[in-house]
Regions:
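Helix-loop-strand module that forms the ligand-binding subsite of alpha/beta enzymes
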Residues: 30-37, 42-55
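Short glycine-/small-residue-rich Rossmann-like dinucleotide-binding loops
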Residues: 18-19, 45-46, 67
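Acidic, glycine-rich segments within the central catalytic cores of soluble metabolic enzymes
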Residues: 65-162
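Structural scaffold positions in well-ordered secondary structure
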Residues: 14, 32, 41, 60, ...
């Protein structure tokens, strides 16, 4: 009841439960849109609100690996056999939040122009895939092009970027 009262005055709802959880509570977009036609509702999940991986749990390190991001990074840091980095910065979380921000701002602009809100489906996986398009294309070529001109150089006490 409290959440529904909060939503009654909200312009935006952002949720990041596994797909289907909000529907169980009657708090999904389809349950709210008739009473709140201007609502901008953003669902964030690991692999999206539909599709073959919809019920897979995800957090940043899982999505780093599933998207190929870890593999691309390992290859650039010493070869495909290198152990993927143990990221201390959860790139997927940051990038997905930034992607959601842009989508929400666009939906708010659309609402100003057309008078209706919308449901936004943001997946961590899709957000991460935006980081590696050149690597994906290169993997499909017989001879993969060199991507980027700047690489860390190994020195006696670590690496330096030139």
């Amino acid at each position: 009841a409290l959440v529904k009262r909060l939503i009654a005055d909200a312009d935006i709802v952002i949720e990041n439960f596994r797909p289907g959880i909000m529907a169980r509570f009657g708090l999904d977009y389809d349950s709210l849109k008739d009473s709140r036609p201007g609502l901008v509702y953003c669902s964030i999940s690991g692999f999206g609100q539909s599709g073959p991986y919809v019920h897979r749990a995800a957090y940043a390190p899982i999505v780093h690996a599933a998207s190929g991001f870890d593999s691309v990074h390992a290859a650039s840091q010493g070869g495909a056999d290198s152990r993927p980095a143990n990221w201390e910065i959860m790139v997927a979380d940051i990038l997905t939040g930034t992607t959601a921000f842009g989508a929400i701002q666009t939906a708010l602009l659309g609402r100003e122009r057309h008078g209706v809100g919308e449901h936004i489906d943001i997946s961590m996986m899709e957000s991460m895939m935006t980081l590696i398009p050149a690597h994906i294309q290169g993997a499909q070529m017989e001879e993969s092009p060199v991507i980027g001109r700047f690489h860390p150089v190994k020195v006696k006490d670590g690496f330096v970027m030139l």
